[in-house]
Amino acid sequence: MRAFNYSTIKEQKWDSDVLGLIAAIYKEAGKQELYLKQRPEELKKLVEIAKIQSTETSNAIEGIVTTSTRIRQLVEEKTTPRNRDEQEIAGYRDVLSIIHESFDAIPITQNYILQLHKILYSHMNNPLAGRTKATQNYITATYPDGHVETLFTPLAPYETPEALDRICEEYNRVIGNMELEPLIAIPVFVHDFLCIHPFNDGNGRMSRLLTTLLLYRNGFYVGKYISLEAKIAKNKDLYYDALAQAQTGWHDGAEDVVPFIKYLLGTILAAYKDFEDRVALVETKLPALEMVRRASKNRIGRFNKQDIRELCPTLSDSSIEGALRKLVATGELKKEGKGKNTCYFRLN
């Protein structure tokens, strides 16, 4: 079976990109901590939006979808699931809520990971919920002509429980001994988890939930206010490319995990930057028109009402719609499309 020893990672020489990302994340985390102490009430809307986005996008990456209205109702627990997709979405909502509320009481062990997986499927009858895989799984690609290619073969079912135990032990050891920088240990753990692919279903969603859990446990709370899952979904191809590069040679312990580390750290930093942008708009106490004007200047290319809502969480939908109408009327924005397909772009 593949051996795991996270102590060897500390001997690696990191390039300026990795070191720069780590330094920038710590700087942004410090700024966020200061803001949370000063203005916690103003950020409640950001939490609500991030929960909805995280639940919607993490499931959508795996082809699990419903309407935006239903997503919002499910996340706010104002309705019950109507079908299998909505059952899976409700399960993700439940796990995410547990992580938000109790991350410091969830140790990184196989037992707790299995419990979280069981909750992920708690709204449906899945006999494999909370159990490691019973049959071999494969990471595949389906091409336009219909042929399927195996890109990576994860560990065999009989190897999986021990491997999951080992990566938890290694992670806890290097973090507990302060032997390895958490922002290196977290992507290494998540990458190993994805290569083990411990479940017959739900590995991608569990990896994203574990990323949030690990970040919270190490004092990086950006995922509570800005959806990391939405960031990953927006750059899904880059995510899969980084994962594929880092998987080469994994079974022999000869993988280069740096592409995945850079990808995940870049995603975390981008979320912190978004947090700073949104806080700047919330903080200024501007009239709705000026808030929407400034938010539109933060967007490159086309954007829709939802994009503005994310940047201006304190504004109601009617205030956003009214401001957009005025900006179109004054010639600052151009409007395209109708209904759900409506989008805008700046003219100057």
Q: What spans do the regions from the language model cover?
A:
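FIC/Doc superfamily catalytic core
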Residues: 1-348
